Regions:
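A cross-family acyltransferase "interaction/gating" segment
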Residues: 129-131, 179-255, 259-260, 274-275
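Catalytic-site beta-strand/loop segments enriched in glycine and acidic/polar residues
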Residues: 160-188
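A transmembrane-helix-recognition feature enriched in membrane-embedded lipid enzymes
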Residues: 15-87, 132-136, 235
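Generic beta-sheet signal
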Residues: 121, 142, 170, 202-204
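Soluble, non-transmembrane catalytic domains of enzymes that act on hydrophobic metabolites at membranes
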Residues: 1-20, 73-90, 105, 148, ...
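Residue-level preference for the first positions of well-ordered beta-strands
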Residues: 94-96, 139, 164-170, 198
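Catalytic core of membrane glycerolipid acyltransferases/transacylases, capturing the structured
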Residues: 41-52, 56, 62-63, 80, ...
Length: 278
């Protein structure tokens, strides 16, 4: 019987504890997954080594090498976390990738699909698992409270574009619960506009094997990051669905382009635009 039919015929709703228990590993497997993940993380940090030099002005070969290494590491970590990826549309290879932001998994997810350079909020550097990898692999951390920091990040993005490396931003400026898309901040779109590079919209959604939205791994608001991580590790399998739209020419001004991209990401995910987090 298909999973959807099994759920529909069940006396319990999809989010009932009975369904969650069937979707979860036991204590022994949970411990083994944590051990395997720790070993993979240690191995990944060793592989990254000294590739943590500033991006601005560095040799293009190092940019490509670091992005490719982050891709390999992300694929290995997602495998240990038992996250499978399903895509729709074409994965971009150049320019700027713009996506909604749901979970600490997003960076691993998108980098597993294409070698790229990320812009993330500074807090990500302190996140378990992905934080140390992001720091070593050259993620650009922005202090969003400092308006002057945008200029520094935009210069680094321009360097990545000059080297032909795909870059990715999360223009909501924060992560959400995934039920909609928050307003896009336009400031980091300027380098793509100046270079007249294509900007590709994308939408991310996480589901359980039963097709239920995996909102327990959405990290937003006052949610505890460790609880979200435990939920991911405890699950037998998580499905990440990434929908890519057609590249958009960056000819408009920043605010207009941000609005166009926001509408397209909403369309890709079939979710509404949200003015604020529910």
């Amino acid at each position: 019987m298909p999973a959807e039919s099994a759920i529909a015929n069940s006396p319990h709703p999809p989010d009932h504890p009975n369904h969650r228990e069937r979707d979860s590993v036991g204590p022994l497997e949970f411990g083994l997954k944590c051990t395997r993940l720790s070993l993979q993380l240690a191995h990944s940090l060793k592989r990254v080594g000294d590739l943590s030099a500033p991006i601005t002005g560095e040799h293009p070969h190092l940019l490509h090498r670091r992005a490719a290494l982050l891709q390999k590491i992300s694929r290995a970590l997602l495998s240990h976390l038992q996250v499978s990826i399903e895509t729709r549309g074409n994965v971009p290879q150049r320019g700027l990738l713009v996506s909604n932001h749901v979970s600490f998994v997003d960076i691993m997810l998108l980098s597993a699909l294409s070698p790229l350079v990320f812009v993330s909020k500074s807090e990500v550097a302190r996140w378990p698992i992905i934080g140390p990898i992001a720091v070593k692999s050259g993620t650009l951390f922005i202090e969003r409270q400092k308006r002057s920091d945008v200029s520094r990040i935009n210069r680094a993005l321009s360097s990545a574009f000059d080297a032909g490396v795909l870059a990715c931003i999360f223009p909501e400026g924060t992560s959400s619960d995934g039920t909609g898309v928050l307003p896009f901040q336009p400031s980091l779109l300027q380098p793509a506009i100046s270079a007249q590079l294509p900007v590709c919209p994308a939408h991310i959604r996480y589901e359980t094997e039963n097709g239920i939205r995996a909102d327990d791994i959405a990290y937003f608001g006052d949610r505890n990051l460790m609880d979200c991580m435990r939920a991911l590790i405890r699950r037998k399998k998580t499905i990440a669905r990434v929908s890519f739209g057609s590249p958009i020419d960056a000819h408009a001004d920043r605010k207009t382009l941000a609005a166009i991209l926001n509408r397209e990401v909403c369309r890709l995910g079939q979710v509404p635009h949200l003015e604020h987090q529910p």
